[in-house]
């Protein structure tokens, strides 16, 4: 695995040993980051179900100001720290060994600019995360990788990459109505 773009472009990162981690492929990661390119500079990012840390490290490489990584598996936490050390990213990141849903349950609204999540497929975790985000929108943008057969709540924009999909949700701006209007008036381009 490698960092695709930014200051660490071409640098190799490693996945934790074993079959428990399903790293996001380069093609999917590139498409994911391309969708977020305008929001990444100086963003505060959260990488949930972080695995190797590839998503968060890619965001940092492309200009994010800080990234918190949340991962419950000890081998993955070690891999994230090792990858961050190799890249020199330790000063602009933190790793939390914790269940992702428990972590976000304590977050206030707008704690992050961007949340990227790649939960295990077919366990309902992606949908649970979206429901938690809707209850308290802890970021402006939530992106979730999931299997194309996993049902997610409506309201996101899904892009498919083989059997994987990435769905992007945006929180309404303060004062926006649910239907996308601001103060009862349609926004330009809405």
Predicted regions and their residues:
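Class I S-adenosyl-L-methionine-dependent methyltransferase catalytic core
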Residues: 1-190
């Amino acid at each position: 695995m490698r960092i695709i773009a930014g200051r660490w472009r071409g640098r190799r990162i490693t996945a934790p040993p074993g079959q428990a981690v399903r790293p996001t492929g380069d093609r999917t990661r590139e498409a994911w980051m391309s969708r977020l390119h305008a929001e990444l500079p100086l963003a505060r990012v959260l990488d949930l179900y972080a695995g190797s840390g590839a998503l968060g490290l890619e965001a940092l490489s492309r200009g994010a100001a800080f990234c918190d990584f949340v991962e419950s598996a000890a081998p993955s936490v070690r891999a994230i720290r090792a990858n961050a050390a190799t890249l020199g990213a330790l000063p602009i990141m933190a790793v939390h060994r914790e269940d992702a849903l428990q972590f976000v349950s304590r977050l206030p609204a707008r704690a992050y600019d961007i949340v990227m999540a790649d939960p295990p497929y077919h366990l309902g975790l992606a949908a649970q995360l979206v429901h938690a985000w809707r209850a308290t929108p802890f970021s402006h943008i939530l992106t979730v990788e999931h299997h194309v057969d996993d049902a997610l709540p409506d309201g996101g924009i899904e892009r498919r990459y083989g059997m994987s999909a990435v769905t992007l949700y945006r929180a309404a701006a303060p004062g926006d109505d649910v239907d996308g209007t601001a103060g009862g008036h349609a926004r330009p381009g809405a």
